[in-house]
């Protein structure tokens, strides 16, 4: 199936790149190609990279581009299949039993079923995007379950029977690579590593998201963030922090601050650990430039 047959208007990597830019997401050619190929091949897309490089935002921008529903499953330590699939609304079931005059009441009717993200994805009747965010935070058991789910796109609820997807969503998984994912899951996906953007690309991102920022300011902020990322920080600043720092510094400059002072006084937008601030304080002027 050609991509355009299902994802109208996205018939090439360039189409993907241009469409994402309309959603204010500046994607590299390599990322746009990975998205295009995952769509063309009907495979999930696995995005790995450091926190803050734009993995989740890529999924959000793509759903906006496709004008489709975004279903997000946020993974965390201890998540299990029941949490991701469904649960029964026990309080409502009990209340219904107390109030029912009909002996034929079925407490396992769909009205008592609380659909969690994966079941919501199975119920899609039109195009959708399933985002499985930070899969590396889940354990290997949940990862194995997820692999099976992505293979069949169906589940069996003992009280309701088998439920199969009538419209498979496009799937994006993200990982911060805090642990290695199982090779079987990787094989099922189109893989792409998102690195921090090049300075020129990051400047374009800042200008697209913060309309009040001048190009010279964006370039200075991006250069400073690049120096920060080269330091052994507890948390390196992501792209979102770059945009916010440029915006914040510009607002202070508009209130009469000098540029060096505006950069310094807004540093809390980009550095959010006291240890990092203390470590860099003696060299802050050098960092800011």
Where are the regions a protein language model picked out?
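C-terminal regulatory/interaction module of P-loop NTP-utilizing enzymes
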Residues: 1-289
């Amino acid at each position: 199936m050609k991509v355009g047959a299902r994802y109208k208007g996205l018939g090439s990597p360039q189409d993907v790149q241009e469409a994402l830019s309309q959603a204010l997401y500046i994607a590299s050619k390599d990322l746009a190609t990975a998205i295009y190929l995952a769509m063309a091949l009907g495979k999930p897309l696995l995005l790995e990279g450091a926190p803050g490089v734009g993995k989740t935002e890529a999924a959000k921008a793509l759903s906006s581009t496709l004008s489709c529903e975004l279903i997000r499953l946020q993974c965390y330590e201890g998540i299990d299949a029941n949490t991701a699939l469904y649960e029964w609304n026990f309080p409502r079931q009990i209340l219904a039993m107390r109030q029912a005059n009909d002996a034929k009441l079925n407490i396992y009717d769909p009205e008592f079923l609380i659909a969690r993200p994966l079941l919501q994805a199975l119920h899609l009747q039109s195009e959708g995007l399933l985002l499985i965010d930070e899969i590396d935070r889940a354990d290997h058991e949940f990862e194995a379950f997820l692999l099976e789910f992505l293979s069949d796109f169906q589940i069996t609820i003992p009280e309701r029977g088998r439920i199969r997807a009538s419209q498979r969503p496009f799937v994006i998984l993200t990982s911060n690579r805090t642990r290695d994912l199982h090779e079987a899951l990787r094989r099922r996906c189109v893989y792409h590593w998102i690195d921090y953007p090049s300075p020129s690309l990051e400047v374009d991102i800042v200008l697209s998201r913060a309309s009040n920022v001048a190009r010279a300011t964006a370039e200075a902020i991006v250069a400073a963030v690049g120096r920060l990322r080269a330091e052994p920080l507890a948390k390196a600043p992501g792209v979102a922090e770059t945009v916010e720092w440029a915006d914040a510094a510009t607002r202070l400059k508009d209130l009469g601050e000098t540029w060096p002072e505006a950069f310094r006084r807004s540093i809390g937008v980009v550095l959010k650990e006291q240890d990092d601030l203390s470590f860099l304080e003696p060299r802050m002027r050098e960092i800011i430039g």
